[in-house]
């Protein structure tokens, strides 16, 4: 089982590989003096990689007790192996470098393959330490049958909690450079060596929270739990992180402060939709926010993250607030994902422009029906010059809303029908079949050629689609009851179906981390609300104000949850060893004096908690928009509203929800967004005898001072340890 020796999680029940060291897999010539008192260079990663490939035959380690110097040797006879026979012998099994023991993997179920270097790098990445520090530390996860090598305080949850809080202060120590001879290791309690434990993932968690634009960050006290299973004894650490920041949801001056709001309501609604549409589909600049930025030698500077403070104040950032989540999303994309996401965004933009552009000589695109029209369609309707002829604000808002919902829901089915557009046409051939029929027959071939022309390498080359059926084929025999023909589809529906299929195939090419559509689909909920409100004739100042405010909040929630999901669940080393147990979003609305007007809480459990939270928050906020200005809920309305927002138990007080629904949003000046999440990771123990000895003496002195009611030495103080 790969990765089973060093970091096996509690749910793994077949772990037998206990010891670990790069000395198990690299020749001795790759190692120099590693005495902390000596001044020697660190073992470079290139050297480790070179040794790894040079010693490929010993990448599999025998687990019969000969994986470390402390374990007893194998009882099997040691065959004489020469360099020339190494490959032959290795082909029949796995070679233990400690004893030369050859174990046949086919007959020995106790053999676990371990790509040691991968686990070493995972440990280094998640603890923030260097590979050299990890090599000196020599981590081990499962201490079954080796407990006697450690002090009792090091191997129990109660003892480790005491050591962590009073002796080593792990909550701070794990954030430092723990390499031998570094300043953090001088004096009490480390004495020039790393600590006896490493909390794998803790430093990475703190770094992830620190790299974001939170105003406050707090962490609960570290808790430790013991895991006792057959042939396993392990420890885990758990911490609750609480990170928050405040956004100013005050007056949106572009329209809220109009003196004659009621008289200009239609223009206000059109302005909101036009601004939001431009942001959602990058109508003017489809490439805005894409790619990486390098500044003064710093590579891949997260510009959108650095600028996000600007987006915390709605009255200042104005229309620049729109599209925040999508702009942040692209910062995590690789080169291939950037090409794909850009193309998908352009296809959605082109489809929307096709629906809303007026039919005139400047906007019309006329092509023969037998051409590969998709590329020309995308280029034409994403051309920035097209914005000069846009008349979105003069169109009926219901039409604009339908168009934006249809475009944003791609590649899903069209929620709004019928669709109509007039700026694109395909000219039929003389005496040929219908245009829509020709489009349908040539769809597969056109999409494949469209994707093949993109500047990227596809995952797998697909077989070319069969050519269109020849018109000269003999007519089939007429059946007595011919099958019913499919309903006739409009030209606009055929255009949308083509774009749907193209986007679907493009999404298959995305990496897993770039497929997180669940964080960026919240806009559809809000546009559907606007559509329903207009049908009911309930568009007014209160609904528009709440729609803008909650859309702004949803942008921030989506951006933050996507960041946390990407770093804590999609980053491979973290997802392998660190578990997400609980996630929570708390929204507190405050007035001008800072008093809480209402608060909302959303909870989710499990590995997918972040994405599930986004779905609940967006649906909840969108549903609440419809209740703006309607006052308190009646008894018969309450049950239906709770169903609309998918209310869960332990998700806040119901009275707070009712207060949120009935409040006048002019009282809300700011929103405090708190993101809480509970994570659990593995504790690894050191196999270094010197570290174990120092820890034993440190614990003995600390216990003695505690019994005498004397204070422990200060950090880095030079003290004499007992023998």
Swiss-Prot record:
Where on the chain is O-(5'-phospho-DNA)-serine found, per UniProt? 651
Where primarily located? host cell
Q: Where is this site: Priming of strand displacement replication by covalently linking the first nucleotide of the new DNA chain?
A: 651
In its keyword annotation, does this UniProt entry include Phosphoprotein? yes
Disordered: region residues? 457-492
User: Could you give one GO CC term from the UniProt record?
Assistant: host cell nuclear matrix
Q: Which UniProt keywords apply?
A: Covalent protein-DNA linkage, DNA replication, DNA-binding, Host nucleus, Phosphoprotein, Viral DNA replication
Modification note: Preterminal protein is used to replicate viral genome, upon genomic encapsidation it is processed first into iTP and finally into TP by adenovirus protease.
Function text: Protein covalently bound to the viral DNA that acts as a primer for viral genomic replication by DNA strand displacement. Assembles on the viral origin of replication in an initiation complex with viral polymerase, DBP, host NFIA and host POU2F1/OCT1. The terminal protein stimulates the template activity over 20 fold compared to protein-free templates. Neo-synthesized viral genomes are linked to two preterminal proteins, one for each 5' end.
Whom does it interact with, and what assembly results? Heterodimer with the polymerase; this heterodimer binds to bp 9 to 18 of the genome. Interacts with host POU2F1; POU2F1 binds to the auxiliary sequences in the inverted terminal repeats and tethers the pTP-POL heterodimer to the origin DNA thereby participating in the assembly of the pre-initiation complex (POL-TP-DBP-NFIA-POU2F1).
The name of this protein is Preterminal protein
From which source organism is this entry?
A: Canine adenovirus serotype 1 (strain RI261) (CAdV-1)
Q: Which gene encodes it?
A: PTP
């Amino acid at each position: 089982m790969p990765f089973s020796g060093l970091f096996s999680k509690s749910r793994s029940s077949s772990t037998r590989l206990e010891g670990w060291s790069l000395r198990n897999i690299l020749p001795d010539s790759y190692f120099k003096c590693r005495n902390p008192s000596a001044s020697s260079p660190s073992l470079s990663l290139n050297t480790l990689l070179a040794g790894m490939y040079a010693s490929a035959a010993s990448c599999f380690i025998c687990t019969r007790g000969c994986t470390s110097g402390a374990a007893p040797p194998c009882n099997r006879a040691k065959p004489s192996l020469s360099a020339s026979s190494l490959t032959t012998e290795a082909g029949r099994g796995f070679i233990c470098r400690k004893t030369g023991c050859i174990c046949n993997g086919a007959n020995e179920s106790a053999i676990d393959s371990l790509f040691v270097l991968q686990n070493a790098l995972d440990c280094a990445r998640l603890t923030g330490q260097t590979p050299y520090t990890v090599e000196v530390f020599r981590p081990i996860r499962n201490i079954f049958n080796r407990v006697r090598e450690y002090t009792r305080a090091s191997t129990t949850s109660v003892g480790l909690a005491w050591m962590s809080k009073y002796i080593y202060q792990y909550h701070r120590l794990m954030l430092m450079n723990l390499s031998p001879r570094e300043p953090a290791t001088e004096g009490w309690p480390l004495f020039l060596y790393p600590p006896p434990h490493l909390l794998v993932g803790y430093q990475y968690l703190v770094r992830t929270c620190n790299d974001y634009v939170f105003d406050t960050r707090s962490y609960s006290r570290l808790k430790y739990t013991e895991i006792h299973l057959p042939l396993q004894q392990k420890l885990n650490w758990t911490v609750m992180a609480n990170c928050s920041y405040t956004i100013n949801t005050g007056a949106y001056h572009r329209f809220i402060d109009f003196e004659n709001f009621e008289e200009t309501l239609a223009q206000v609604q059109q302005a909101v939709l036009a601004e939001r549409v431009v942001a959602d589909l990058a109508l003017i600049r489809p490439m805005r926010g894409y790619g990486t930025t390098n500044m003064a030698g710093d590579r891949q500077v997260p510009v959108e993250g650095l600028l996000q403070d600007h987006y915390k104040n709605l009255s200042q950032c104005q229309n620049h607030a729109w599209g925040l989540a999508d702009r942040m999303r692209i910062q995590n994309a690789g080169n291939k994902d950037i090409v794909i996401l850009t193309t998908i965004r352009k296809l959605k933009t082109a489809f929307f422009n096709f629906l809303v552009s007026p039919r005139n000589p400047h906007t019309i695109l006329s092509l023969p029906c037998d051409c590969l029209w998709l590329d020309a369609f995308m280029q034409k309707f994403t051309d920035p010059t097209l914005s000069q002829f846009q008349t979105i604000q003069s169109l009926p808002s219901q039409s604009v809303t339908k168009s934006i919902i249809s475009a944003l829901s791609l590649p899903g089915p069209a929620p709004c029908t019928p669709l109509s557009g007039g700026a694109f046409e395909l000219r039929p051939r003389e005496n040929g079949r219908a245009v829509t029929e020709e489009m349908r027959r040539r769809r597969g071939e056109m999409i494949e050629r469209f994707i093949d022309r993109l500047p990227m390498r596809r995952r797998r080359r697909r077989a070319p689609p069969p050519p269109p059926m020849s018109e000269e084929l003999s007519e089939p025999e007429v059946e007595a009851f011919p099958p019913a023909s499919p309903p006739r589809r409009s030209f606009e529906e055929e255009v949308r179906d083509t774009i749907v299929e193209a986007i679907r195939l493009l999404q298959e090419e995305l990496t897993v981390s770039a497929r997180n559509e669940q964080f960026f689909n919240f806009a559809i909920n809000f546009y559907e609300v606007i559509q329903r409100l207009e049908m009911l004739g309930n568009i007014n100042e209160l609904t528009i104000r709440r729609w803008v405010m909650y859309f702004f909040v949803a942008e921030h929630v989506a951006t933050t949850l996507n960041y946390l999901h990407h770093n804590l669940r999609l980053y491979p080393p973290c997802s392998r060893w660190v578990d997400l147990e609980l996630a929570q979003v708390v929204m507190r609305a405050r007035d001008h004096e800072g008093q809480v007007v209402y608060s909302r809480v959303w909870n989710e459990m499990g590995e997918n908690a972040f994405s599930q939270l986004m779905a609940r928050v967006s649906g909840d906020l969108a549903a609440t928009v419809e209740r703006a200005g309607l006052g308190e809920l009646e008894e018969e309305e309450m049950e239906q509203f709770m169903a609309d927002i998918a209310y869960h138990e332990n998700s806040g007080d119901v009275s707070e929800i009712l207060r949120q629904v009935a409040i006048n949003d002019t009282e809300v000046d700011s929103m405090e967004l708190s993101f809480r999440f509970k994570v659990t990771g593995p504790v690894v123990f050191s196999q270094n005898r010197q570290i174990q000895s120092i820890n034993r003496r440190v614990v003995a002195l600390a216990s003695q001072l505690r019994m005498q009611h004397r204070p422990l030495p200060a950090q880095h103080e030079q003290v004499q340890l007992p023998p």
